[in-house]
């Protein structure tokens, strides 16, 4: 009646004692950590994971922050949640049980996780559009914002990772449990509105990519792309396809190289990077809100909490949090560097010639100094790859938030008939986004204003991160440090101030 089903890899078995006359039961000795020991005393089915290190390709693939990557992590994480309340001896036992990387490359891969790849994946198709429009419209004027947003982005993402690691819960579930359902509903609504707009923008971006390649209107690609992504996300393990599109999305790294050969005025670039230049015109303010929203967005807040919750890291809590900080720093710096050079590149090639970005082809012109006539094809490939990777993540984060708000079972590792509510939310969000994408809204304007909306909504979630991260009942002795708190407060003030200036411009008719 009270038996527990175990799956024990052979490498975890240390000795086997068969039945004797005096002892009717045999004895199997296995290596387990303190966390696993506690889990074995709980009800339900558990699984002891193999100590053997994954091969390099498998290890790398499990770090990819796609819906499929999260599905794999969910399947692995059957051991009970770890907690900051573990005693030091338990942490030491966990450290002893954890396998050591065999090479420097494996060590790097063991650190790289949701933080790095969320930072890089944050440069989705709509974000690329926002950065390109900013560079083409404002030149080098907002480069200082990219520098300022880097430590702020680090603070926000680190706080989210720490919350996920310590609580082993999703953000919406934490808010519902400790602050009530109304607070959780508000946070989920913020995320839903932002994500639906971003998914619509990314669908349009993918369609625009196909338009550059085929010459057919982007409009005809939206429904097939949405249907294919829904099917792959819900029903299929699209591991091979995922690898291809991740590689395609790296095409935007070409902006870094192009910026170097674009003839940019590097003296002006350096001045504009370190000396803030604030322009209170509506076009400049709205563009500033867009790039802030593209950098620190609602979905990355929810996704970082969920990703760190699912990420397996060896060692005691202090080491896990330190590894998460390094992971996030790598992602934030890499992602913001790409965004920085996109602005430099478009400023040096489009702004200086008084050009504008009205279509995807206009945005592709920024790559022509390096790539010539093939620029539009590489840009199209990048748009398609970035969009295909981002949309499932946006949909999944929406489903996790709503499911956590109402206490529904959630997880991509379960089949649709086992998780009807979770997959219904995902489907409804995609249908609404598809309808918005089909509404004949100007594609470039949709890309831009989706990120403006992100910038307006993000401060609400930053406040929630502050509240949760400093709540003793939730975080125990692992509350956020003073530097992280300062970063969160400054992030809130900067983004909120930009949003207020945007609203002032709209109310005074500057946006018309």
Language-model features and meaning:
Residues 118, 145-179, 186-197:
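Juxtamembrane transmembrane-helix boundary signature
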Residues 188-189, 213-235, 251-256, 420-432, ...:
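Transmembrane alpha-helical segments of multi-pass small-molecule transport proteins
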Residues 250-276, 288, 292-308, 464-473, ...:
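Hydrophobic alpha-helical segments and their helix-loop junctions in multi-pass secondary transporters
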Residues 162, 166-167, 184-215, 222-226, ...:
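Hydrophobic transmembrane alpha-helices that form the core helical bundles
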Residues 181-182, 219-223, 330, 334, ...:
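Loop-to-transmembrane helix boundary motifs in multi-pass membrane proteins
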Residues 152-166, 306, 310-314, 333-362:
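Extracellular/periplasmic helix-exit of transmembrane alpha-helices
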Residues 224-225, 233-263, 453-454, 458, ...:
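Membrane-interface loop-to-helix entry segments
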Residues 91-96, 130-135, 158-183, 208-210, ...:
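Flexible loop linkers connecting adjacent transmembrane helices
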């Amino acid at each position: 009646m009270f038996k527990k089903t175990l799956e024990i890899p052979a490498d975890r078995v240390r000795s086997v004692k068969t039945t004797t006359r005096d002892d009717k039961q045999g004895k199997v000795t296995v290596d387990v950590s303190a966390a696993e020991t506690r889990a074995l005393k709980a009800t339900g089915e558990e699984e002891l994971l193999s100590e053997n290190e994954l091969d390099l390709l498998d290890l790398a693939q499990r770090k990819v922050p796609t819906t499929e990557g999260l599905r794999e992590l969910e399947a692995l994480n059957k051991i009970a949640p770890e907690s900051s309340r573990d005693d030091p001896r338990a942490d030491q036992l966990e450290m002893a049980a954890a396998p050591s990387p065999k090479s420097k490359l494996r060590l790097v891969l063991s650190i790289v996780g949701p933080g790095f790849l969320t930072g890089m994946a944050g440069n989705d198709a709509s974000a690329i559009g926002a950065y390109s429009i900013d560079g083409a419209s404002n030149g080098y004027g907002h480069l200082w914002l990219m520098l300022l947003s880097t430590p702020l982005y680090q603070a926000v993402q680190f706080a989210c990772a720490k919350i996920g690691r310590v609580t082993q819960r999703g953000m919406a579930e934490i808010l519902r449990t400790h602050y009530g359902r109304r607070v959780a509903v508000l946070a989920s609504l913020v995320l839903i509105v932002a994500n639906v707009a971003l998914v619509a923008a990314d669908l349009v971006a993918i369609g625009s990519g196909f338009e550059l390649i085929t010459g057919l209107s982007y409009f005809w690609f939206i429904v097939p792309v949405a249907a294919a992504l829904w099917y792959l996300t819900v029903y299929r393990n699209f591991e091979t396809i995922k690898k291809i599109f991740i590689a395609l999305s790296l095409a935007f790294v070409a902006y870094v190289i192009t910026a170097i050969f674009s003839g940019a005025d590097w003296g002006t670039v350096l001045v504009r990077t370190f000396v803030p230049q604030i322009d209170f015109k509506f076009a400049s303010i709205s563009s500033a809100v867009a790039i802030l929203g593209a950098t620190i967005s609602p979905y990355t807040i929810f996704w970082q909490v969920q990703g760190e919750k699912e990420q397996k890291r060896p060692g005691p809590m202090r080491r896990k949090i330190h590894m998460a900080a390094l992971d996030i720093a790598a992602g934030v710096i890499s992602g913001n560097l790409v965004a920085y050079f996109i602005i430099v590149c478009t400023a040096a090639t489009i702004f200086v010639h008084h050009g504008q970005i009205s279509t995807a082809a206009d945005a592709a012109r920024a790559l022509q100094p390096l790539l010539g006539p093939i620029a539009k094809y590489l840009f199209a490939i990048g748009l398609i790859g970035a969009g295909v990777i981002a949309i499932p993540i946006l949909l999944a984060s929406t489903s996790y938030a709503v499911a956590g708000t109402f206490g529904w079972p959630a997880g991509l590792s379960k089949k649709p008939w086992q998780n009807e509510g979770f997959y219904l939310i995902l489907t409804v969000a995609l249908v609404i986004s598809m309808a918005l994408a089909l509404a004949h809204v100007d594609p470039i304007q949709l890309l831009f204003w989706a990120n403006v909306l992100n910038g307006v909504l993000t401060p609400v979630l930053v406040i929630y991160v502050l509240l949760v991260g400093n709540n003793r009942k939730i975080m125990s002795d692992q509350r956020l440090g003073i530097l992280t708190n300062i970063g969160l407060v400054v992030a809130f003030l900067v983004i909120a101030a930009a949003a207020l200036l945007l609203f002032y411009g709209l109310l005074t008719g500057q946006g018309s």
